[in-house]
């Protein structure tokens, strides 16, 4: 077995590597695994494999982490790396990982600086208050500019960077960094083989002045963070390395500033100091402190759990993945307590008991079975049947529900039609597996056509899902054109609407009367529906109230204009009547359903469409064409700015107008422009577009 899980949580870091798709995230992660792999490989003589053998084998396999979380060791510290994807269609994956990590390394391209995807991931990290250090990568690249990149962190992210290193040389001559904390040069001169140790040198003469200037800025920032340090510094005393690092750590953990270091992962330069910075400045589970949840069945009652083995067990499932040998792996972050393989736990989210089969921590090149799961760590569990992303697992005797993750509804759909009966069966298996892994993947059956309709967060997302069905599950199917996931809502309040459901067909009949109010509504947590019972005096027996709610929710699946789901409404049940013999749960369910449909027709129903936040980067000479094209797609231009010598146009554009955009953009700009697109919000469609949508849906 590899190195044991560290139980001293001061020596544990749960981190993510965040980056734009091309900033070098995979290479950076590979290098971290290699350098830390060397560290723990040395202690493993029993398998006779040398480090170089392992590296060759990894080269063949290409360590692009397929695991959701990888454990490695550095200088007697344990680092659990949670993988975060770099593409915009997978922002949910990013949110999912940010929810369970304690700190992150934001990787930037030293030439491009902060790019659109970096901005988005940075904002998501801010939402979960994740402390970050910044690694300016690709310093060996033509046109790389460390100081420009630091400025873009200020200008584009509105963040406060704290420079801890300066680059020595640039582009092909990038040889190392000046360490401003210890005032020394760390160099990797010439072509550096992977795994080579750096040389510690004097600061080069041409950088002494600049290093002194940045060192002074660093010391002033450190001194201002603590009264005792301020007195010492301004009293002319030297601050020790420990004092400087301690102050930087405190400010980083509080997200007051973001330490900036640099290197070239590809050229093996700057990786070891980056790992040192992860240990020195990013928080451990004890820094993060207790996790807050609520009582099972009562969201008003808050419960906390400390990151300690002595507390009752609690964990959050953050990713489901398929494994070729073990089947379904459930990745969890354990927040408190401990648990053994074979133990039974409560899935508090679903109210079901689950038995844990085996427990693993994933290493770069193998699964490492462990004897227990303890607070502060990330594990893969085997054997959980009903647990999905966002579920809480806990001690049955001390239940807690941790804050779950909210996922956006899919904005784009395609129909999928299996070619043969055997494909139909395989499709069923594929859909079940993919839905377990990805909470933004939706499936429904079109009752009219009998086709299966799948939904996702963008064209690329759906392309990848369909491709996985073909490759992994061998499903041959015809895939339809992408369709927009429209919604319907109401714009006016209906103060009072009554509906009586009455049926008499010999014997006992059916009777239920409801009086409801309907109004537009959006919940604070993004909820799109609320039911309030205002019935008093037993006019409707208590046991029938949930049936009215259930009937209304059923009716919301198919709107009143074009059959799209109804969202953003509140239904208040005001009054009603019942019959001792003829009333039933079914009768009140029908009444609730019909009352909602009729009231919605009177409440100014409209169709909503998904708007995408589109960002186009283009050479200046094509700016006019790009803006004209976006306007013709019903786009609203939000902002224009200059970035790295190019122009950037930000706009909100309906998704329905963005199909095939990449081809049009390339032809208009001779392939020199690119764009990114992410879901922003739903908005009401104009009347003329609404008419077309309704006509298409109703066939009129």
From Swiss-Prot:
Stretches assigned to the tr-type G domain: 10-286
Subcellular location: Cytoplasm
GO molecular function: GTP binding; GTPase activity; translation elongation factor activity
Keyword Mitochondrion: no
Top-level taxon of the source organism: Bacteria
Pfam families, A to Z: EFG_C, EFG_III, EFG_IV, GTP_EFTU, GTP_EFTU_D2
NCBIfam families: EF-G, PRK12740.1-5, small_GTP
Role this protein plays: Catalyzes the GTP-dependent ribosomal translocation step during translation elongation. During this step, the ribosome changes from the pre-translocational (PRE) to the post-translocational (POST) state as the newly formed A-site-bound peptidyl-tRNA and P-site-bound deacylated tRNA move to the P and E sites, respectively. Catalyzes the coordinated movement of the two tRNA molecules, the mRNA and conformational changes in the ribosome.
Membership in a protein family: Belongs to the TRAFAC class translation factor GTPase superfamily. Classic translation factor GTPase family. EF-G/EF-2 subfamily.
Protein's name in the database: Elongation factor G
Lineage: Bacteria, Bacillati, Actinomycetota, Actinomycetes, Mycobacteriales
């Amino acid at each position: 077995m590899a190195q044991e899980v560290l139980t001293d949580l001061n020596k544990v870091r749960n981190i993510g590597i965040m980056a734009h798709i091309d900033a070098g995230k995979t290479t950076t992660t590979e290098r971290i695994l290699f350098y830390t792999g060397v560290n723990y490989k040395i202690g493993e003589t029993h398998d006779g494999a040398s480090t170089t053998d392992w590296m060759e084998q990894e080269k063949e396999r290409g360590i692009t982490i397929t695991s959701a979380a990888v454990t490695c060791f550095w200088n007697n510290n344990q680092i659990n790396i949670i993988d975060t994807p770099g593409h915009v269609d997978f922002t949910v994956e990013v949110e999912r990982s940010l929810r369970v990590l304690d700190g992150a390394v934001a990787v930037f391209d030293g030439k491009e600086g902060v790019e659109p995807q970096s901005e988005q991931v940075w904002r998501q990290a801010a939402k979960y208050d994740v402390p970050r250090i910044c690694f300016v990568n690709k310093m060996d690249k033509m046109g790389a500019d460390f100081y420009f990149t630091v400025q873009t962190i200020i200008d584009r992210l509105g963040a406060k960077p704290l420079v801890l290193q300066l680059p020595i040389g640039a582009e092909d001559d990038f040889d190392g960094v000046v360490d401003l904390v210890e005032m020394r040069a760390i160099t990797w001169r010439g072509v550096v083989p992977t795994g080579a140790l750096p040389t510690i040198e004097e600061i080069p003469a041409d950088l002494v002045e600049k290093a002194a200037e940045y060192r002074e800025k660093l010391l002033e920032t450190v001194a201002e963070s603590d009264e005792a340090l301020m007195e010492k510094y301004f009293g002319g005393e030297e601050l020790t390395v420990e004092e400087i690092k301690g102050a930087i750590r405190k400010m980083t953990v509080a997200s007051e500033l973001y330490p900036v270091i640099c290197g070239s992962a590809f050229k093996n330069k700057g990786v070891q100091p980056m790992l040192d910075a992860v240990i020195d400045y990013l928080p451990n589970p004890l820094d993060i402190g207790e996790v807050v949840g609520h009582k099972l069945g009562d969201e008003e009652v808050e419960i906390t759990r400390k990151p300690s083995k002595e507390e009752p067990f609690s964990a959050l499932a953050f990713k489901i993945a398929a494994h070729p040998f073990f089947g379904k792996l459930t990745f969890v972050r354990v927040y408190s307590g401990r648990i053994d393989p074979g133990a039974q736990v409560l899935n508090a989210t679903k109210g079901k008991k689950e038995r844990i089969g085996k427990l693993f921590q994933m290493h770069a090149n193998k699964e490492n079975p462990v004897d227990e799961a303890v607070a502060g760590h990330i594990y893969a569990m085997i054997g959980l049947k009903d647990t999905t992303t966002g579920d809480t697992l806990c001690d049955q005797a001390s239940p807690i529900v941790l804050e779950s993750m909210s996922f956006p509804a899919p904005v784009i759909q395609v129909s999928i039609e299996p070619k043969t009966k055997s494909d139909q069966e395989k499709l069923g298996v594929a859909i079940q597996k993919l839905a377990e892994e990805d909470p933004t993947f939706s499936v429904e059956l079109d009752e009219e056509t009998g086709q299966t309709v799948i939904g996702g967060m963008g064209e690329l997302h759906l392309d990848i899902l369909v491709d996985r069905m073909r490759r992994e599950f061998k499903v041959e199917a015809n895939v339809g054109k992408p369709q927009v996931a429209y919604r319907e809502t109401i714009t006016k309040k209906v103060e009072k609407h009554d509906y009586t459901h009455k049926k008499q067909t010999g014997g006992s009949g059916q009777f239920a009367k409801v009086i409801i109010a309907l109004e537009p509504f959006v919940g604070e947590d993004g909820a799109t529906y609320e039911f309030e019972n205002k019935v008093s005096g037993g006019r409707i027996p208590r046991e029938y109230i949930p049936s009215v709610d259930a009937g209304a929710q059923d009716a919301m699946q198919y709107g009143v204009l074009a059959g799209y789901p109804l969202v953003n409404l509140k239904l208040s049940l005001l009054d009603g009547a019942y019959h001792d013999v003829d009333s039933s749960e079914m009768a009140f369910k029908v009444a609730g359903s019909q009352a909602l449909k009729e009231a919605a027709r009177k409440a100014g129903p409209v169709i909503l469409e998904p708007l995408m936040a589109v960002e186009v980067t283009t050479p200046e000479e094509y700016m006019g064409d790009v803006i004209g094209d976006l306007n013709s797609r019903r786009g609203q231009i939000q902002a224009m700015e200059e970035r790295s010598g190019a122009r950037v146009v930000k706009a909100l554009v309906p998704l329905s107008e963005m199909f095939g955009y990449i081809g049009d953009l390339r032809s208009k700009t001779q392939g020199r422009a690119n764009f990114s697109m992410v879901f922003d919000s739903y908005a009401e469609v104009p009347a003329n577009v609404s008419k077309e949508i309704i006509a298409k849906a109703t066939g009129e």
